[in-house]
């Protein structure tokens, strides 16, 4: 029992520590970071956000903004950037966000290319075709999407609405620069969209953490994100705790004890047969532990 409690406490600590952004911009009527230490520069136009809150999102119509963010991960350091986007036009490229230097592998940005039919390329831009991660996805105007781009020092990933679109390993990134831009790619401005809740992390969030971030911030009434089993290492995990215990089978000597249902996952897949009673038999590693009634 002590081992189980220590494991859950450790997992909870990792989850809380890893999912705290180093900078966050909510665009709730201003361009300031959530801690009011820095701000984007420019004359903004604010519109309803994905929940319908007035002046809760920033409208970018062929207009860009920049901010000096000293917390932007440099070189090949791990990182995650997430943002909510609603496109008002999809017939031209939307340069959502970026930072770094316009040189081979020294850039880190997010682009949604112009639509071709009902689809479009979502791009994690690293400056240079060999440094980009490109995934073709359906694209519709007037719908809010949540994007996440991550890099752990080796593996680059791009997500939308909690779903992993593409993962590429082996790209050596040497990102250099502390100016964060929205609405432009290097010196070129091209965007017609509303953006909200831009967050910068100094860790590469796991697949499970990205799904959790999407589910916890999507507007009410949104369809659940489609999730798929994906390859690649899972370096951090998230634990969900229930408040009301449920009874489960136990030896005769413990029939008066009440326990919770514990499910164990590794790399997005449930480990069949793993539960609270035999968690100590699992091989060494990092797991997602789900506790429920």
Segments from the language model and where they lie:
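Extracellular glycan-recognition modules
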Residues: 20-40, 62-121, 155-156, 189, ...
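Extracytoplasmic low-complexity segments
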Residues: 2-8, 14-63, 211-237
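Short tryptophan-centered beta-strand motifs in secreted/extracellular beta-sheet-rich domains
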Residues: 142-151, 158
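Flexible glycan-contacting loops in extracellular carbohydrate-active proteins
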Residues: 168-194
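C-terminal outer-membrane/trafficking sorting elements
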Residues: 231-293
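A glycine-anchored, Pro-Gly-centered beta-turn/N-cap motif
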Residues: 77, 142-143, 283-286
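Short, aromatic/His-centered strand-loop micro-motif at the edge of beta-sheets
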Residues: 122-146
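Beta-strand-rich interaction surfaces with strong enrichment in secreted/lumenal proteins
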Residues: 68-72, 134-139, 169-171
